[in-house]
Swiss-Prot record:
Name of the protein: SPbeta prophage-derived uncharacterized protein YonA
Originating organism: Bacillus subtilis (strain 168)
Domain of life: Bacteria
Gene name tied to this protein: yonA
Lineage of the species this protein comes from: Bacteria, Bacillati, Bacillota, Bacilli, Bacillales
C-alpha cells in the first residue's frame, strides 16, 4: 500500500490537479474551505512528489501539507520557494487573529510577506466577514496593501 499524505485547501475557492505521473490521468479536486474548515484530501506520496516537481501549487500556497512527520518534512524541504510557501498558507483563523491582534505596524509587517494574489484575496474575503469590527486604521492598511485608495470599495 502506498504512503498517503494529507493536503489541504485553506482558501475558499476550489482547486484541482490533473496528475499524469503514472502514465495515466487522475484528477484530484479540493472544493475549498467552507465556514473556516479546510478541505483535506489524502493523496499518494508519489502525487505530492510529482506536484513539487511539476507545479507551483505549494510555492503559491494553493495546497498545504498538513502533517508533520519525517516524510512531509523531506517534501517541505524540497519545495523550491519554501519561504513563499510558509508566508502564503494562512487558515481563516490565522487571518482573523492576524487582523484582530497586534498593532498596525505588526499587521503591515505580516501582510508585506504575502506575495500570492489568491492569498491576498482570501485575506480580504475573510476580513470582509467581520469588517465592522476592524479599526479604521487597519481597514486602511488592508486597502493600501491591495492598491485601493478607499477602504469602502473593499469593505462595505
Amino acid at each position: 500500500m502506498t504512503e498517503k499524505i494529507k493536503l489541504a485547501r485553506y482558501r475558499s475557492t476550489s482547486y484541482f490537479v490533473g496528475y499524469t505521473g503514472d502514465g495515466g490521468h487522475k484528477q484530484y479536486t479540493w472544493s475549498g474551505s467552507k465556514n473556516g474548515k479546510a478541505d483535506i484530501k489524502e493523496v499518494p506520496k508519489e502525487v505530492v512528489e510529482w506536484l513539487t516537481m511539476n507545479s507551483v501549487c505549494f510555492d503559491k500556497g494553493e495546497l498545504v501539507i498538513v502533517e508533520d512527520n519525517e516524510t512531509t518534512k523531506e517534501i517541505k524541504d524540497s519545495i523550491v520557494e519554501s519561504e513563499a510557501y510558509e508566508n502564503n498558507i494562512h487558515t481563516k483563523e490565522e487571518i482573523e487573529k492576524m487582523i484582530k491582534s497586534g498593532n498596525i505596524a505588526q499587521l503591515k509587517n505580516k501582510l508585506d510577506k504575502i506575495t500570492v494574489d489568491s492569498e491576498k484575496q482570501f485575506i480580504i474575503d475573510v476580513a470582509s466577514e467581520f469588517s465592522d469590527d476592524i479599526a479604521a486604521g487597519k481597514l486602511k492598511v488592508l486597502a493600501d496593501w491591495m492598491g485601493v485608495a478607499d477602504p469602502s470599495l473593499l469593505f462595505d
